[in-house]
Amino acid sequence: MGKNKQSESSKRWLKEHFDDKYVIKAKKQGLRSRAVFKLEEIQAKDGLIKPGMTVVDLGAAPGGWSQYAVKQVGDNGHVIACDILSMDPLPGVDFLMGDFREEAVLDALLNKIGGKNVDVVMSDMAPNMTGNDTADQAKSMYLVELSLDMCRQVLKKNGSYTVKVFMGEGFDQFFNEVKNAFKVVKTRKPDSSRARSREVYLVATGFKL
């Protein structure tokens, strides 16, 4: 019975995925994922990424956000990406594969970044979901805390940050933490984010150091 339910749920997800206009649009445009449209909407509203900037992309694979960011920063900019999963090379993107919770990987990433000279930290990280809402929420909040900690280590004064957060336990506390670290914090729900998803994006500007 459980398997049948799971199978029906998987079929529904696959149908929804392949009928999704953003999935179709991403394929037509040669983009790596539909997630790029979320960043594109954030960029249209908030203009976080500018030519010549240095951007760090956490949880980058398969590379949709990095693919978009590298076009925005141009030849004089720099995109540094990190993910536990492998990612096909992208021109202009400096990719490090590994789990930055591990000290050696974190050190290698910080070495690539080279100090507090980052203009934008962005994170579309999400844990592998188990279906246990309490455990999944705790894991997702742990990841967003890690991305905020990365901001504290690498962002320059007045730098910016955008991060995917799932509404639920711990959200309000995290929102307040971000508010304490940045001058302005906004919550965005891009049109390309599925309506039934609890995900939202925090967009924070004016890092206080």
From Swiss-Prot:
Catalysis performed (reactions): uridine(2552) in 23S rRNA + S-adenosyl-L-methionine = 2'-O-methyluridine(2552) in 23S rRNA + S-adenosyl-L-homocysteine + H(+)
Predominant location: cytoplasm
GO CC annotations, alphabetized: cytoplasm
Residues annotated as catalytic: 164 (proton acceptor)
Keyword Transferase part of the UniProt annotation: yes
Enzyme class (EC, first level): transferase
Gene3D superfamilies on file: Vaccinia Virus protein VP39
Protein localization: Cytoplasm
Keyword annotations of the record: Cytoplasm, Methyltransferase, rRNA processing, S-adenosyl-L-methionine, Transferase
A molecular-function term among this protein's GO annotations: rRNA (uridine-2'-O-)-methyltransferase activity
InterPro entries reported for this sequence: RNA_methyltr_RlmE, RNA_MeTrfase_FtsJ_dom, rRNA-MeTfrase_E, SAM-dependent_MTases_sf
Protein family per UniProt: Belongs to the class I-like SAM-binding methyltransferase superfamily. RNA methyltransferase RlmE family.
Function (record text): Specifically methylates the uridine in position 2552 of 23S rRNA at the 2'-O position of the ribose in the fully assembled 50S ribosomal subunit.
HAMAP family reported for this sequence: RNA_methyltr_E
Designated name of the protein: Ribosomal RNA large subunit methyltransferase E
Organism of origin: Pseudoalteromonas atlantica (strain T6c / ATCC BAA-1087)
Encoding gene per record: rlmE
